[in-house]
Design a protein with these regions (language model features):
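Transmembrane alpha-helix boundary and packing residues in multipass membrane permease domains
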Residues: 46, 127, 259, 263, ...
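The feature captures the transmembrane alpha-helix scaffold of multi-pass secondary transporters
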Residues: 237-244, 256, 269-273, 315, ...
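Glycine-rich helix-loop "coupling/hinge" segments at transmembrane-helix boundaries
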Residues: 250, 261-266, 276-277, 290-292, ...
């Protein structure tokens, strides 16, 4: 009897236990993870130092020159001849400490922008392909989806020609494909000829304003986009087309693809952001698609579909909240990869344009002076890269464990 009473009390204790959300439980597990807390502290210090330096510590890289103080070792105490240089100076007499701190802002910008590009484009594509692979869309859902898809794809020729209206033209092509499919049932096969030709002509004519080579490139891009938009949206066809494009991008080594994109666009921090963001799109697309396809097989999603809930309600109420955990973890680790990729591009001279401070560019400018004993010119930018990447990776590992529903107590 006593054993039975003990079990009953345990059930009662469980019944009256305070309800806790997934996010509260995740936060408690995160702060209990010492490794994750180390990563969180490193990330917070990195964010605070980069933000403070950018907004409250003015720095003009073009005027930060002192040829009489070239390659000085770290100096902690000022003298009559030399000022304080905590990290020493580089080949032009520039203070490495200030450049390292301000370079953190550029690395932070690259990480945030690149991950945002990858997450928004890849996440939306993965969400839509996974959700609508087995669910039929009505006319207005197809109309809105194809309009947005045409607009997104049209941003590529619009960016090449610097003419924003091209994105609007391809949005109209996407919307027109749905109308064509709905109201011209007897001529559906002709869309395979009409829309690719329309996309090629519109893109090529707009590209002629810039030059013949740009018109040729835009014509080919417009042809491919028009062919893609001519396909009926929904079902496995839409998913297969998007995923095969993602597979093609993944077939290239990420660093080589980023270098090729930057070489085509030209050097610069903004071009590096775009290149790193484009390379990361397939990762988020595949992750979001697999997560969505797993969630859509759950009983609560099938039940909501059975009772007639709208697709948008199912998508935003049942599916999207339940796929955020792996995406948040991937985005956190993606920040580390973006910072590392930006440093690699900067080291090769394809990132920030000198004299803009950036950790990879600082390494590329200073590694040749190691043989002369100027170790500080390489050590501190390298440590900054290592610590920031390590911090985001440790935090990402901790978030992955904290957000795992299998270990929720």
């Amino acid at each position: 009897m006593e054993e039975t009473k003990f079990e009953t009390n345990g059930v009662e204790d469980f019944a009256v236990r305070e309800h806790r959300s997934l996010w509260i439980d995740a936060w408690r597990r995160l702060i209990a993870n010492r490794t994750a807390m180390v990563g969180l502290i490193v990330v917070v210090l990195f964010l605070l130092s980069a933000t403070f330096a950018h907004f409250f510590w003015d720095y003009e890289p073009k005027s930060d020159l002192d040829y009489g103080a070239k390659l000085l070792p770290p100096q902690l105490i000022a003298t009559e001849e030399v000022d304080v240089h905590l990290f020493g100076t580089d080949k032009l007499g520039r203070d490495i400490f200030r450049r390292t701190i301000h370079g953190g802002w550029n690395s932070l910008r690259v990480g945030l922008v690149a991950v945002s590009i990858s997450l928004l484009i890849g996440g939306i594509l993965g969400l839509l392909t996974g959700f609508f692979e087995s669910i039929h869309m009505n006319f207005w859902e197809s109309f809105i989806l194809m309009t947005l898809l045409g607009f997104a794809l049209g941003m590529l020729p619009a960016w090449i020609t610097r003419q924003f209206f091209q994105a609007i033209l391809f949005a109209l092509i996407g919307a027109g494909s749905v109308v064509f499919d709905r109201y011209l049932n007897g001529k559906k096969k002709h869309r395979l000829y009409i829309f690719p030709a329309a996309g090629a002509i519109l893109a090529a004519l707009s590209g002629l304003i810039v030059g013949p080579m740009v018109a040729l490139v835009c014509g080919i891009v417009g042809l491919l986009i028009g062919f893609f938009l001519s396909k009926p949206v929904g079902g496995e066809l839409f998913s297969n087309i998007v995923m095969r494009i993602m597979d093609i991008i993944l077939s290239f080594p990420s660093y080589l693809l980023a270098i090729a994109i930057v070489a085509f666009l030209g050097p610069g921090l903004e071009k590096g952001m775009i290149a790193i963001g484009v390379v990361g799109i397939p990762v988020y697309a595949r992750l979001a698609r697999s997560a969505v396809m797993s969630v859509t097989q759950k009983e609560y999603v099938l039940a909501s579909h059975a009772v007639g809930e709208s697709h948008s309600r199912m998508l935003f109420r049942h599916v999207l909240p339940n796929i955020l955990s792996p995406i948040i973890v991937q985005a956190t680790m993606g920040l580390a990869n973006a910072i590392l990729s930006a440093a690699a591009l900067g080291f090769l001279g394809l990132g920030a344009i000198p004299p803009e401070p950036e950790w990879g560019a600082m390494l590329g400018d200073s590694y040749k002076y190691l043989s002369s004993g100027a170790w500080w010119a390489v050590l501190f930018p390298g440590l900054a890269i290592m610590l920031s990447v390590l911090g985001f990776n440790l935090l990402g590992d901790g978030l992955r464990d904290a957000l795992d529903p299998k270990i929720r107590l």
